[in-house]
């Protein structure tokens, strides 16, 4: 890859640092999409011993690229995102990916197809971590930053997504315990 090509990719990806998510950090500022993606990858790194049969390098690659489409559309909270929003994001992302140099355009297109199909252990794990990271972040944010629907959503979000793994079911239960304690405490 030529240096100018790499710089063009990085300049585009940099926009994820400015795309904010619905959630807040513990310091009361909106979390960026880049921060969410980073911590999803950090989760994958630390869970490699729990999933020895899973290609964790692939899960980390999925985590790194999973929200790049939000460069073009911004972040839309899951409870507001429509199928049309998803299609627009996917279309704009595919247009950008097609401009990338080989073999990266092919690799990314294949990863996105695998992620969307949710048929492999890697895709299932990436998706579970994506959702779990969001709930963990909400638990870390001040309660007064939550929208009304998040009190129930944060108790159930990702429950279906983690069902394939006993470890993730236990992790989700631990996260729910934190959510319940946060709500009771009122902070």
Q: For each of these PLM feature ranges, what is it?
A:
Residues 1-187:
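Active-site helical microenvironments for divalent-metal-assisted chemistry
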